[in-house]
Amino acid sequence: INEINLYSTEMAAALCALDNAKISANMSNRLSEAIVDSYKKTNGAPITFEQILTNYQSKLQNPEKDDSISSILKQLVRNKLFENEDKANLINECFIVKMDAFPKDGPIAKAIVYFLISKLNLIYEQLEKQAVSDDYVQIRHFTIIDEAHYMLDFDNRPLRNLIAVGRNKGLSIILATQNMASFQSKHFDFYANAQYPLIMKQQTITDSVIKDLFGVSGRELQEIRTEIAGLQKGELIIKDQMAFALDLGKKYKKIKVSHLI
């Protein structure tokens, strides 16, 4: 029961995070209660958005009148995003999730990423640590999110948790965006947790980001700005970990690649 109560609070926070609409404390509490009621009716078995919506509406004075929560739930139900049972092997198979049918900054696209990443969290928490030798570490899985800025501007807890969990489980997470400032999220310090920041040519170069990544200012800052602005196709700027640690020489390297994976 305690686990369900905790999960109901987390799920309520998740649904609230998917939309920018203002959600009152009463709505959030009502949603948590609806989730708990749904689990009671399934005796702890997995629940669906339809069940949550039905139980949520039963707590409204006028079930026909939508509020912010019921509106989100109806969108999730209407779009039939997920199966009622697991049929995909997210570890041993490769999937491309196409989301171009949905507005990238809307609740449906966010829900797809949010709950898929949540599922990966559950899987990776159960795995043994990655194999490590003197020369190599095991990479089990790549999770790549293109146009990631749409997924960084809200409280995306599963993504934060996956970054933390994946570090010693052989998970590589690649967050790709055209604007380096997108990683300066108020919800999470993505730069502090980025082991290998890769910078391609940028239309907008943010000084505060360069300072955070490379620990530079003044002439060194301007030098890196110039290098980024002059990057050609396939060229990247990366942090020189050795120079950064020793505080010697240039804090960056310029490399040329044909592909990243």
Q: What do these predicted regions represent?
A:
Residues 1-171, 184-187, 227-244:
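P-loop NTPase motor domains
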Residues 20-30, 183-261:
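P-loop NTPase motor core of the ASCE superfamily
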Residues 72-79, 175-179, 214-218:
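A short linear-motif detector with a strong N-terminal bias
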Residues 95-97, 174, 196-198:
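Hydrophobic/aromatic beta-strand patches that form the interior of the parallel beta-sheet core
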Residues 101-103, 179-181, 204:
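Active-site-proximal loop/turn and secondary-structure-junction residues that shape catalytic pockets
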Residues 168-171, 176-183, 201:
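Conserved H-loop
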